[in-house]
């Protein structure tokens, strides 16, 4: 099988570094480009760091992006022109940016996920099923913990779980979005979905969804111990996307969760 030419955008970040390591150990990929938003005179794995340009991505089959929203949109403009596939692991998009991603997906295959872990995506699926099975008596909230360097909150994964709750009720997450707390020891339930984000230490990721009727509490949770589970998932997504038609895909499509 011919190796897939891979570009990693956001290569100096935590996920970027892990992706470089994982891709070097994966026989399906050949690392062809490493980029950052600003020019940096440096080589990693024998590859000179570059900025996001058409020339940089010319020989690439698929781009894995772990950057920031405005950078992701710049990458999508280039990828759309070159007809390159993009795996988006970036989080923190607003509604307007989400709409632009959907627009780009009409011309190129895009897989977007706030979390590339099999376990987290299974948790999201179970969250939706649970939400669908419970009546309005049950209130829900989402709790997440990440390392102190993570800036956005709630995390992309927490929002995925919130979407799972909303989807279970056949409602839009933005209409069910409750309060967003940061570094609170405890936080309340509400008629809408409340989120609490903790930022401390070097924690890779912990997520918990809770449903409460006042008579009982149902908890669904996931804890990550190794960042490689995310990079391995991103590479699996990149390989899967190679033979796909233009469209906006998720890990749920890849894992065939219905």
From Swiss-Prot:
It is found in: Cytoplasm. One of its GO terms (cellular component) is cytoplasm. SUPFAM superfamilies: Glyceraldehyde-3-phosphate dehydrogenase-like, C-terminal domain (SSF55347), NAD(P)-binding Rossmann-fold domains (SSF51735). NAD(+) binds at residues 10-15, 89-91, 113-116. The active site is at 146 (proton donor/acceptor), 150 (proton donor). Keywords: Amino-acid biosynthesis, Cytoplasm, Diaminopimelate biosynthesis, Lysine biosynthesis, NAD, NADP, Oxidoreductase. (S)-2,3,4,5-tetrahydrodipicolinate binds at residues 147, 156-157. GO terms for molecular function: 4-hydroxy-tetrahydrodipicolinate reductase; NAD binding; NADP binding; oxidoreductase activity, acting on CH or CH2 groups, NAD or NADP as acceptor. The keyword Oxidoreductase applies. Gene3D superfamilies: Dihydrodipicolinate Reductase, domain 2, NAD(P)-binding Rossmann-like Domain. It holds the Pfam family DapB_N. Pathway: Amino-acid biosynthesis; L-lysine biosynthesis via DAP pathway; (S)-tetrahydrodipicolinate from L-aspartate: step 4/4. NADP(+) binds at residue 38. Catalyzes the conversion of 4-hydroxy-tetrahydrodipicolinate (HTPA) to tetrahydrodipicolinate. NCBIfam families: dapB. This is 4-hydroxy-tetrahydrodipicolinate reductase. The gene is dapB.
């Amino acid at each position: 099988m011919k190796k897939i030419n891979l570009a990693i955008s956001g290569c100096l970040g935590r996920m970027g570094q892990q992706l470089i390591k994982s891709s070097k150990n994966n026989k399906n990929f050949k690392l062809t480009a490493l980029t950052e938003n600003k020019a940096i005179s440096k080589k990693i794995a024998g590859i000179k760091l570059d900025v996001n340009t058409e020339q940089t991505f010319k020989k690439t089959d698929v781009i894995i992006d772990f950057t920031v929203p405005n950078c992701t949109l710049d990458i999508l403009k280039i990828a759309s022109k070159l007809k390159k596939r993009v795996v988006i692991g970036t989080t923190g998009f607003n509604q307007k940016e989400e709409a632009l991603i959907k627009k780009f997906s009409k011309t190129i295959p895009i897989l977007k996920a706030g979390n590339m872990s099999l376990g987290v995506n299974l948790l999201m699926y179970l969250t939706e099923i649970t939400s669908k099975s419970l009546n309005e008596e049950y209130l829900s909230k989402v709790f997440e913990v990440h390392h102190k360097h993570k800036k956005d909150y709630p995390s992309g994964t927490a929002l995925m779980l919130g979407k799972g709750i909303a989807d279970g009720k056949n409602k839009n997450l933005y209409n069910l979005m409750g309060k967003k707390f940061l570094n609170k020891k405890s936080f309340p339930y509400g008629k809408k979905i409340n989120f609490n984000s903790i930022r401390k230490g070097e924690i890779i990721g912990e997520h918990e969804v809770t449903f409460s009727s006042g008579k009982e509490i149902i908890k669904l949770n996931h804890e990550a111990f190794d960042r490689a589970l995310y990079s391995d998932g991103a590479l699996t997504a990149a390989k899967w996307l190679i033979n796909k038609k233009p469209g906006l895909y998720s890990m749920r499509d890849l894992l065939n969760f219905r």
